[in-house]
């Protein structure tokens, strides 16, 4: 983001993309069969950092919503952040989390998609953005910002697919919503602004559903681990939480009736759309649905989501 020279930034992007893809292949090939399950040291510190960042994100979105008269976006951001802060300081400290990170075959496949395809898109974007502003001189060039958001997007996706801790997954989930908003609104035209806020509105609605689900699961079942959640016996309260998580997944993956935001995303530069479709947002929603599959079989929630 701080590098203003195109040539230097292009070298950094290429090297970063190569390292990301190489590490992705190494980790996946090395751990794909046996997997990894671990709890990170300093979990409370990480949680505190996440909380602070969530507050900053919420303030940014609320301010942007008010400034652009998209008040429902501000309301959604305020509600979900307030709910999560309340949960953090009232119930969360009572819940012990045994496994924060899980790398199994499913997350391994997702890591490959994010790391390899995402890196290829970043490499493609180097050449694409070189000529984009030549052909569209009416748009202000913000290439440092553009590439910074691309890599922020990939980082959030890695965190999302590797997190067994629902709080961490939720945080990464919301970072992807913010990233998509920033990329879709890149040109700052009226159409781009409207479509970026449409994407933010739908995905923040899903984020609010995600937050409510976390509160239900944490208070009722005293767990915040996705692996533990999927082993619980389906009952009404749990199925309500699962349904809310499915709503979040459907909004993120732009499934009917939440698909309109993805069409609007086409106003962004092509690498943005490629990333949204192939390696980030759409895949995130599908990933969560697959994770929840054990709780969807032979249940009313599963049938409803399928329909």
Regions found by a protein language model. Give the residues of each.
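...captures the hydrophobic TM-helix bundle architecture rather than a specific catalytic motif
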Residues: 1-307
């Amino acid at each position: 983001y701080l590098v203003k020279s195109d040539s230097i930034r292009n070298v950094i992007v290429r090297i970063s993309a190569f390292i990301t893809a190489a590490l992705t292949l190494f980790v996946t090939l090395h751990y794909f069969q046996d997997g990894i399950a671990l709890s990170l040291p300093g979990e409370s510190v990480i949680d505190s950092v996440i909380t602070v960042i969530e507050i900053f994100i919420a303030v940014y979105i609320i301010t942007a919503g008010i400034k652009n008269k998209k008040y429902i976006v501000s309301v959604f951001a305020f509600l979900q952040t307030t709910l999560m802060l309340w949960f953090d300081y009232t119930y969360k400290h009572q819940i012990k989390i045994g496994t924060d990170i899980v790398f199994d075959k499913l997350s391994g496949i997702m890591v490959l998609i994010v790391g390899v395809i995402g890196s290829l898109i970043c490499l493609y974007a180097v050449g694409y953005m070189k000529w984009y502003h030549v052909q569209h001189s009416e748009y202000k060039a913000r290439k440092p910002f553009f590439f910074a958001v691309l890599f922020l997007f990939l980082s959030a996706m890695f965190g999302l697919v590797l997190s067994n801790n629902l709080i961490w997954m939720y945080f990464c989930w919301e970072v992807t919503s913010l990233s998509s908003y920033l990329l879709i609104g890149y040109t700052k035209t009226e159409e781009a602004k409207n479509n970026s806020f449409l994407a933010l509105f739908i995905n923040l609605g899903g984020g609010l559903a995600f937050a409510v689900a976390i509160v239900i699961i944490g208070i009722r079942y005293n767990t915040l681990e996705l692996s533990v959640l999927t082993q619980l016996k389906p009952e009404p309260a749990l199925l309500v939480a699962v349904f809310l998580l499915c709503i979040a997944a459907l909004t993120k993956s732009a499934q009917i009736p939440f698909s309109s935001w993805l069409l609007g995303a086409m106003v962004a530069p092509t690498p943005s759309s490629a990333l949204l479709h192939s390696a980030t947002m759409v895949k995130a929603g599908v990933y969560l649905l697959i994770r929840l599959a054990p709780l969807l079989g032979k249940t009313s929630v599963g049938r409803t989501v399928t329909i």
